[in-house]
Amino acid sequence: MACPWKFLFKVKSYQSDLKEEKDINNNVKKTPCAVLSPTIQDDPKSHQNGSPQLLTGTAQNVPESLDKLHVTSTRPQYVRIKNWGSGEILHDTLHHKATSDFTCKSKSCLGSIMNPKSLTRGPRDKPTPLEELLPHAIEFINQYYGSFKEAKIEEHLARLEAVTKEIETTGTYQLTLDELIFATKMAWRNAPRCIGRIQWSNLQVFDARNCSTAQEMFQHICRHILYATNNGNIRSAITVFPQRSDGKHDFRLWNSQLIRYAGYQMPDGTIRGDAATLEFTQLCIDLGWKPRYGRFDVLPLVLQADGQDPEVFEIPPDLVLEVTMEHPKYEWFQELGLKWYALPAVANMLLEVGGLEFPACPFNGWYMGTEIGVRDFCDTQRYNILEEVGRRMGLETHTLASLWKDRAVTEINVAVLHSFQKQNVTIMDHHTASESFMKHMQNEYRARGGCPADWIWLVPPVSGSITPVFHQEMLNYVLSPFYYYQIEPWKTHIWQNEKLRPRRREIRFRVLVKVVFFASMLMRKVMASRVRATVLFATETGKSEALARDLATLFSYAFNTKVVCMDQYKASTLEEEQLLLVVTSTFGNGDCPSNGQTLKKSLFMLRELNHTFRYAVFGLGSSMYPQFCAFAHDIDQKLSHLGASQLAPTGEGDELSGQEDAFRSWAVQTFRAACETFDVRSKHHIQIPKRFTSNATWEPQQYRLIQSPEPLDLNRALSSIHAKNVFTMRLKSQQNLQSEKSSRTTLLVQLTFEGSRGPSYLPGEHLGIFPGNQTALVQGILERVVDCPTPHQTVCLEVLDESGSYWVKDKRLPPCSLSQALTYFLDITTPPTQLQLHKLARFATDETDRQRLEALCQPSEYNDWKFSNNPTFLEVLEEFPSLHVPAAFLLSQLPILKPRYYSISSSQDHTPSEVHLTVAVVTYRTRDGQGPLHHGVCSTWIRNLKPQDPVPCFVRSVSGFQLPEDPSQPCILIGPGTGIAPFRSFWQQRLHDSQHKGLKGGRMSLVFGCRHPEEDHLYQEEMQEMVRKRVLFQVHTGYSRLPGKPKVYVQDILQKQLANEVLSVLHGEQGHLYICGDVRMARDVATTLKKLVATKLNLSEEQVEDYFFQLKSQKRYHEDIFGAVFSYGAKKGSALEEPKATRL
């Protein structure tokens, strides 16, 4: 047999004589040098000045022919590696052990080539020759035994002999499990392009070398994914499949990663999904995979076992952990619909160790944030979202000098890190990763005298020179064991079943488009056999669009569904519809959202349809408004009059009471009705998504409370819950603007920023405030909780996962005490919904209470009870005293306490460090004045504040209610009561511009209304001062409670005193008109204005509607409207009549 001993001390002796070459740093000739004996450790203590001494040793019990072998010791040459940031110098000697040359040429550097030949292994068509395999095997065995702290000479020599004999007998050899584990870890340690190698010794190795079929490969991979994902606490792992034999029986994973998203070339030339996977996605389709044509479809596994043709396996969805992207500051970021998988697992690399090749060895670490935020999301050949994010941020994307790309990519990375951390999924930012690599590099130079590193790959794609790796010189070389790239298997595979062979294609754009077009044609044929369903939406905030897309998802299980915004839909298309589903909000005074106005106009002009269809409508709104869901009902009535058939009753989603529950119930009801009406095949076997069929009961065994050491950061918690940029202001002062004669209270609230200056705002914008519930309500509920934790104990709610096998943290609320949750996060004043009452019924120990609660689940009973009592949650517990509610129920079922919005009553230029608000304090009694006293949540909370108390808040932009860009344009301001609030910011801004900028504004007339000049004429003296300073042109006030005089409202003033002024401003001078107040006033004002304009300009009803439509389109008719609070049985004339809806 071949003798291994000659390789024991001079591992490289089988190679040709080394050529002399000059060291680029030391300019001396390189000469062959002896290597460490495997019996001597590469002890860090033997290194001096960063360069290890070369030691020699004599092995025991070696053949007599080697007794006279003499190995001389020479000091190895080194390469100086400098850190230009710190000035530190390292000496690399490890590169002398490099196993192959790089492909760089004498006159050119190929360091930036993605897959250089030197790092790529191709296929083989015959076994590795013995004379090539044996030296590598001996070298690895020496390396393995040289890693022990204590020499194992006898075991070492025995293993050398066994390996040599096995190679001579079989032509190859098998690694022991310990050798395999050592090899995989060392290959990671030697990977020059990996920045996270400091964890190299913590790699979990799964030995799958006994695998024989693709099905077994799939099972091993599923185990790998499950272990590595670990519910988000990612663990690094590798699974090693059988080694290459003769090159004809390879095991391969055709995927580049275990988990990756598909990419589709659509018929119109656009790309949907990940553009980097276009070729592989098409291959999967050719192999029989059914595409779904979504942006984030997980590709199947394509597995090749024993050289056979590949097989396709769908990864079980429950194995794929995905993170939905959101931003801690920009709530619109969620509208981008981005997500990413948590597990980065490379699947297509080859492990080389000791002359053996393992072409199937998927392995994973965890993500560095920039891999997703920069490369996956922002690369132009990937998802390419950079410009869209820049536009949404309001950046100047038309000029590179604005650095919009840098600002946008930073926020995208912030979103990625925030999303992973919020969902408790392992991720590392690029700064921390860079620091960890520098530590690893220092460790390696102390331990091995070097660290192969590819600077181009290790410097993160953002931040550049502010990361330490940027300033570090690096030496790149290949050591063994090593992970190599491979040629894509579909380019070299020899097909055994020609029927399975995909059509041979080059990745040419034209060919790929044709293939995708053909696949899409097949999909269209399938979809064409289904009934067409169009989902129309109109929205101001994006809520209706989100629900419309959810509805489309549900209907796509049985219908050919598309989603269309109303501003992109033509009324004439109705003639072609089969099923029309409408989801829309109602805006302002019963109007449609802005993107529904054009369709509304054309739809309501139609007189009849030649073709009828089925339809269903769902409206969103707030029951605070008298025209609740008015536009949805208008659509319903118009479609019915045109002859269309209603599929299901019009649904209503109340923002104040279980809106999403109502939508889900309506959606499922409508879907089932549609399946019955259109006789959908297999309609009884369609699996409706779980989010639409959530259980109407609450199971206590599904929830538990655990203690948490995390202290509550209120601002951070509110920011996370509401996706707002929450900051703290302090109360400076508050002053009652009403006189002592008035029974009501309206406050001028002055808030100051913490620090010199807070976030910027414009006149007319809103301040959102996060109030706290009243202490008495909170304490009353706590006293009735059956398992109430100690008052100040921080707890965290956990829920069982769907499989029921483990607990996961509920992400709705942060860890906090129950008292804090009831005070700051949960709504305890809004009446419970019917669904909540149904869930509560199970906790009633008295049968009468239980039956009454069940009866209230009926719409008629519920509505009477709700509108008569308007009960708080505490009042419900008092009405049904046998209720024993657990703390977990409150934390999981009570709705989130929403912020209250107030128009800002100050100009930031005029009072730079302050924000002023005009707040009406609301109190009322239910049951015709005989019920308990109710207090407005936010107004009462503000009234009880003391100077310097904190106020968590945020600024909400109101783009449609700001001063004209041209200050010379005339304005009419109409605002009775607290509707005056934004106009105070207007006149303060005009005063500042006049005094400090010399800008002379156009005439600005104010129309104000209140009850009595000696009771509630808000800002009376300030208005008079603005008139004297000619900031306000004129002020007209209507009083509605002057004894012995008729009531005068703002619309009366417009009609009797300002008709000519209105016409001049709107029609003659192209000016602006602003209305702020409750919806009833705005409706009356609009009616008066239309009559006035119609009379003056001799317009028909249709023409005047079109005239005001044009005013709104030109953004010259502005409304800031809030809903009137209706008296849930309140006594007429009570303080409730102050219209303050969302500002309670």
UniProtKB/Swiss-Prot annotation:
**Which residues lie within the region annotated Disordered?**
37-59
Which keywords fit this entry according to its UniProt record?
Calmodulin-binding, Cytoplasm, FAD, Flavoprotein, FMN, Heme, Iron, Metal-binding, NADP, Oxidoreductase, Phosphoprotein, Ubl conjugation, Zinc
Q: Give the regulation of activity.
A: Not stimulated by calcium/calmodulin. Aspirin inhibits expression and function of this enzyme and effects may be exerted at the level of translational/post-translational modification and directly on the catalytic activity.
Q: What is the effect of changing residue 27 to A/Q?
A: Loss of interaction with SPSB2
Comp. bias (Polar residues): 47-59
What induces its synthesis?
By treatment with endotoxins or cytokines. Induced by lipopolysaccharides (LPS) in macrophages (in vitro). Expression in the liver oscillates in a circadian manner with peak levels occurring during the late night.
Similarity comment text for this entry: Belongs to the NOS family.
- PANTHER family per the UniProt record, alphabetical: NITRIC OXIDE SYNTHASE (PTHR43410:SF4), NITRIC OXIDE SYNTHASE OXYGENASE (PTHR43410)
**Protein name from the UniProt record:** Nitric oxide synthase, inducible
Organism name: Mus musculus
Give the gene that encodes this protein.
Nos2
